């Protein structure tokens, strides 16, 4: 098989044969070469319905013609100039006009960069030491984020990462998502030196875990009380459920917002944004340093504008309803076979936890049956449905998914469940 041979070559070039850990699974990861709409195709020509969507960015589906044309036009006009461009202004205005908490922003090349700079900015603004993150919350692969993190660090049983200095871990406090007492106790002890709380408003790298009623409001209240900043990491949730941030849906205004994924139309991108007062601390107007050769690069800006202009006219209820219908059908299938699952979802995000109990916290999530999940993943793969290959990632639905995809996914799930 061509894919097996290529992966053998990849193993000689890249650690575990991949360039990001969660892409690896045994015996051999599928090697893809193209996509169109809701479908992706491997190097052997096999077609799959895709619910990974590049881990979230491809909300319009693969090879969207408007996004592809925008990238091609920009490539013909130049790939990198090392200076400000009109398209940076255009994309920045789209985001500013639809995310109320953002007055100014900086584009970066990834969500990792965005959260890294947001944390530095919060410390620079408050002149405080500690960052408080949530257990299982994932904010990228920089040192300050890799402490009791989610995503691949959970998939492979690594609590954080070797190579992160103890001096850094001592500046990061870890609270429990959906546990107000946990957060309050940390503020009682360290509150006057907590620069910021950073959280995904919906945890999306530990599967999907929704906030309990009042929890995010509590975070806003306690950070205000202690003059700490609240950072919402909306790299996943930004423009996923509506043409806005999730913060605008729930009407909670963070002090700093990070975004990525969808706003780049599938091209590499991230951003962090805040009030003018806070953002003006960024160099060269202030003394909090941030830079990047490829930040705001023309290809990503062109892709982002095309994607966002198209998204602005889309009816989000379509993908939200598709997801709700799929989740209901999956519950029926699992219940019919007396298999205990909890399927957490919001909007067009969902994840299946092989767990008889509700999953509301990190502790709940890690009790899920990872082996059974992987068996289900493999059987779905055998039936031409590609899910993210980890119990602790998230499935996504795109505007390219339609009734035929839904029906085929349900039939595949019926076959898969009978084998696990």
UniProtKB/Swiss-Prot annotation:
PANTHER family: GLUTAMATE-1-SEMIALDEHYDE 2,1-AMINOMUTASE, GLUTAMATE-1-SEMIALDEHYDE 2,1-AMINOMUTASE 1, CHLOROPLASTIC-RELATED. One of its GO terms (molecular function) is glutamate-1-semialdehyde 2,1-aminomutase activity. NCBIfam families: hemL, PRK00062.1. Keywords: Cytoplasm, Isomerase, Porphyrin biosynthesis, Pyridoxal phosphate. Belongs to the class-III pyridoxal-phosphate-dependent aminotransferase family. HemL subfamily. It is found in: Cytoplasm. Its cofactor is pyridoxal 5'-phosphate. Pathway: Porphyrin-containing compound metabolism; protoporphyrin-IX biosynthesis; 5-aminolevulinate from L-glutamyl-tRNA(Glu): step 2/2. Its main location: cytoplasm. This is Glutamate-1-semialdehyde 2,1-aminomutase. Its EC number is 5.4.3.8.
């Amino acid at each position: 098989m061509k894919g097996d041979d290529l992966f053998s070559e990849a193993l000689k070039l890249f650690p575990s044969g991949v360039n990001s850990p969660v892409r690896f699974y045994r015996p051999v990861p599928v090697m893809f070469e193209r996509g169109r709409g809701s479908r992706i195709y491997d190097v052997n020509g096999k077609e799959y319905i895709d619910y990974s969507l590049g881990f979230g960015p491809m909300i319009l589906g693969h090879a969207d013609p408007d996004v592809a044309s925008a990238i091609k036009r920009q490539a013909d006009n130049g790939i990198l100039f090392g200076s400000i461009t009109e398209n940076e202004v255009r994309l920045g205005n789209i985001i500013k006009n639809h995310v109320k908490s953002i007055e100014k922003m900086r584009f970066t090349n990834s969500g990792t960069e965005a959260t890294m700079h947001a944390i530095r900015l919060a410390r620079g603004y408050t002149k405080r030491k500690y960052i408080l993150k949530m257990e299982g919350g994932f904010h990228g692969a920089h040192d300050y984020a890799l402490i009791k993190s989610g995503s691949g660090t959970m998939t492979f049983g690594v609590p954080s990462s070797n190579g992160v200095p103890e001096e850094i871990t001592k500046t990061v406090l870890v609270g429990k998502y959906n546990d107000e007492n946990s957060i309050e106790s940390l503020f009682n002890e360290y509150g006057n030196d907590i620069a910021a709380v950073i959280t995904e408003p919906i945890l999306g790298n530990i599967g999907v875990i929704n906030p309990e009623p009042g929890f995010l409001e509590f975070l806003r209240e306690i950070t205000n009380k202690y003059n700490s900043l609240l950072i919402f990491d909306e790299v996943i949730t930004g423009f996923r459920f509506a043409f806005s941030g999730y913060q605008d849906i729930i009407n909670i205004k963070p002090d700093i917002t990070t975004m990525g994924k969808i706003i780049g139309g599938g091209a590499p991108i991230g951003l962090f944004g805040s009030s003018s007062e806070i953002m003006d601390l960024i160099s060269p107007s202030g003394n909090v340093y941030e830079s990047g050769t490829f930040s705001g690069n023309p290809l990503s800006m062109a892709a982002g504008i095309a994607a966002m202009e198209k998204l602005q006219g889309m009816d989000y209820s379509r993908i939200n309803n598709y997801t709700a219908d799929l989740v209901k059908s999956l519950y029926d299938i699992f219940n019919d076979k007396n298999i205990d699952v909890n399927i957490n979802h919001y909007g067009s995000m969902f994840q299946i936890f092989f767990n008889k109990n509700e999953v509301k916290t990190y502790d709940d999530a890690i009790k899920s049956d990872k082996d059974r999940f992987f068996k289900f993943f493999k059987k779905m793969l055998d039936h031409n449905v590609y899910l993210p290959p980890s119990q602790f990632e998230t499935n996504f639905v795109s505007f390219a998914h339609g009734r035929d995809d839904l029906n085929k996914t349900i039939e595949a799930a019926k076959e898969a469940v009978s084998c696990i």
